[in-house]
Regions:
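Bacterial N-terminal signal peptides that target proteins for export
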Residues: 1-9
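N-terminal signal peptide c-region/cleavage motif recognized by signal peptidases
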Residues: 18-20
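Interaction/scaffold regions that mediate signaling and macromolecular assembly across diverse proteins
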Residues: 24-79, 83-90, 94-274
């Protein structure tokens, strides 16, 4: 009898786990609906702005989505595929960044939130996996953790609510489209001449490539392990030479790794649409 009860208990536990796993919406439709509604494409689709005033009127829908993320147990998350995990973490980062802005709106820059002893990126204002979490914990301690995903393109997917940052995507990231979405975000950002350009004999790129340059020199092969190992920024820029420069001669210099590299000033102004 005891063994029968034990078997029933185990079966029930497995059933509950499977129901829980099935219950999470990996299409992230709730977030998809919100960004489709409140993200405005600019610069020919290479950048975006966010209508935070209108977003604030959909606060209940945003809260419901963020609550669905917080409800996912860590054990369930660990059982997902890497693309599912990454899509979850990227959307979570972007969703909680919007929430942080709305909590402090109106604000001219995300850097105006908090101070020396209350870093906005280390503020524990939400929960994931039953733990107090903060934005840096998602980006730097999880997404960028060596050996976890090894995917430099994630820098073009997470959005820090700033003009200098890669755009907030106008759709949710999903596992089935992740590689295409990451590549498209990369090309959009690199082709935006306000943030990356070849000028006066120099390749001028975003400060992102300076702050996180180790991500382009650690031999990363992408989340699926299929990307040729990334060993240097110069080698990676060479892959995107036709995106980074407009003139064929300039593209050739980048492709050959002969371009001098400089960094553009980062614009921390809020990416708000008016």
């Amino acid at each position: 009898m005891k063994s029968f009860v034990k078997i029933v208990g185990l079966a029930l536990g497995a059933l509950l786990f499977s129901v829980s796993a099935a219950a999470f919406d990996h299409s992230h439709k709730a977030w998809d609906d919100l960004v489709k509604k409140h993200v405005v494409l600019i610069n020919g689709g290479k950048a975006s702005k966010v209508n935070y005033v209108a977003f604030g009127k959909d606060r209940a829908a945003l809260k419901a989505y963020l609550d669905s993320l917080s409800a996912v147990p860590e054990s369930e998350f660990k059982g997902w595929s890497k693309p599912q995990q990454m899509a979850f973490l990227i959307n979570a980062y972007n969703g909680y960044t919007v929430e942080l802005i709305l909590q402090n709106y109106p604000v001219k820059s995300i850097k105006d939130i908090g101070g020396v002893f209350d870093n906005r990126w280390k503020r524990k204002f939400f929960k994931l996996f039953g733990q107090d979490f903060y934005l840096d914990k998602i980006e730097h301690e999880t997404l960028r953790k060596p050996g976890a995903y090894d995917e430099p393109r994630v820098h073009f997917a997470v959005n820090c609510a700033s003009i200098g940052c890669p755009m907030l995507r106008e759709e949710a990231f999903t596992a089935d489209k992740l590689d295409r979405q990451l590549e498209e975000q990369t090309v959009r950002f690199l082709s935006d001449r306000s943030r990356n350009r070849y000028a006066d004999g120099k390749l001028e790129v975003s400060m992102i490539f300076n702050w996180f340059k180790d991500d382009w020199s650690s031999g990363y092969k992408g989340f699926d392990g299929k990307t040729p190992a990334i060993t240097s920024r110069e080698a990676w820029f060479a892959r995107y030479a036709k995106v980074l420069a407009d003139a064929p001669a300039d593209q050739q210099k980048i492709a050959e790794g002969k371009a001098a590299i400089g960094h553009l000033e980062y614009d921390w102004s809020l990416n708000g649409a008016h």
